[in-house]
């Protein structure tokens, strides 16, 4: 427990913060790495560490450093790589973005409005550094397009976007960053641009697909509400390292089971239910306790075979097909840092 920024509250508070790596697509998401962040006040306090049973090998690391380690571990475990999505608290960190590039991955990283970039010029002259907010305000009207990226619960989701090729301005001592895309959102009913992303994805990616990727974080935010409130991920009140991760592991396992069941068991309704063939009783079925005209001797008394124990004709839910690439769109689940 430490007084620090709490994303759920949007302000400073006494709380515990975890760095999470999830895999996600439009249908579901699932955390695959979950680690408690320990600030300096904890890592440098030996009595406090001992009381909370913090392993001696744990040293202070920033949240971006923990996130990068989680991505490396996922790749080492042969998790299918996808585009890395980050909110602004991670995406603004140039070291994390560069580390992702060195791993051979692409990212779509939300950034804050004060991040400096150099717009790419056709004459190859080196432009001055400018904040992404100032760059957005200076774009001509024809640079903006209204993009619809998906169907919402009540209406199509759309907003106004622009994209510009830029170089992220390096900090002192950093090498020049490669050319990438700055994506900007400026809803028509807002006085100024509201959101910014840096993306090193293929320049040939369609405008809509780029917006769709940037907006995929809604899946994580939506699922985290269920994880924290319905499953109880946010209910832990203990003070030990092991207890925190034990509670998180069980909560995530329970959530993984639930999203598997949602795929296996369709919602109630005549349209979906009619598609499910009801299992038929096997030939020769006899209710338990009914007289058997051909009673068996004691060694063969129980004639029920294990194959009759379950008559469900469903796929094994352990493979979680909702997180595999669909046939309609062969796209891997993306990495999302939370």
Task: Report residues per predicted region.
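Short, hydrophobic/amphipathic alpha-helical patches that form generic packing surfaces
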Residues: 20, 248-261
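Short, solvent-exposed helix-loop connector elements
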Residues: 95, 199, 207-214, 229-246
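An anionic, glycine-rich sequence signature occurring as long contiguous blocks
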Residues: 10, 24-60, 108-219, 314, ...
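Structural motif
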Residues: 8-14, 238-249
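Conserved nucleotidyltransferase catalytic core and NTase-mimicking acidic/glycine-rich helix/loop elements
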Residues: 258-294
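Extended, low-complexity cationic-aromatic segments
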Residues: 1-21, 49, 115
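Short, conserved catalytic/metal-binding motifs centered on acidic residues
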Residues: 1, 6, 21, 83-90, ...
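Domain-level cores of phosphate- or acyl-group-handling catalytic modules
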Residues: 48-125
């Amino acid at each position: 427990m430490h007084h620090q920024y709490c994303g759920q509250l949007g302000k400073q508070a006494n709380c515990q913060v975890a760095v999470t790596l999830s895999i996600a697509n439009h249908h579901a998401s699932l955390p695959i790495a979950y680690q408690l962040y320990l600030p300096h006040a904890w890592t440098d306090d030996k009595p406090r560490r001992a009381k909370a049973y913090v392993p001696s090998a744990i040293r202070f690391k920033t949240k971006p450093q923990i996130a990068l380690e989680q991505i490396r571990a996922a790749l080492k475990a042969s998790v299918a790589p996808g585009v890395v999505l980050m909110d602004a608290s991670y995406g603004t960190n140039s070291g994390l973005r560069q580390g992702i590039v060195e791993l051979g991955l692409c990212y779509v990283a939300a950034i804050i409005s004060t991040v400096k970039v150099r717009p790419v010029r056709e004459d190859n002259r080196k432009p001055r550094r400018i904040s992404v907010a100032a760059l957005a305000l200076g774009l001509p009207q024809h640079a903006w397009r209204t993009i619809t990226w998906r169907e919402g619960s009540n209406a199509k989701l759309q907003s106004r976007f622009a994209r510009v090729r830029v170089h992220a301005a390096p900090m002192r001592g950093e090498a020049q960053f490669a050319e990438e895309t700055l994506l900007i959102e400026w809803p028509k009913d807002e006085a100024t641009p509201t959101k910014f992303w840096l993306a090193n994805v293929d320049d040939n990616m369609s405008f809509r697909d780029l917006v769709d990727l940037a907006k995929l974080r809604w899946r994580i935010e939506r699922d985290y509400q269920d994880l924290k409130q319905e499953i109880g991920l946010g209910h832990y009140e203990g003070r030990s390292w092991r207890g925190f991760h034990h509670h998180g592991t069980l909560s995530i396992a329970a959530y993984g089971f639930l999203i598997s069941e949602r795929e296996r068991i369709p919602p109630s309704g005549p349209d979906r239910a009619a598609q499910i063939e009801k299992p038929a009783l096997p030939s020769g079925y006899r209710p338990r306790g009914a007289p058997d005209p051909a009673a068996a001797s004691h060694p063969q008394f129980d004639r029920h075979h294990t194959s009759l124990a379950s008559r469900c004709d469903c796929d094994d839910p352990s493979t979680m097909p909702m997180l595999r690439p669909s046939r309609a769109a062969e796209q891997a689940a993306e990495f999302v840092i939370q």
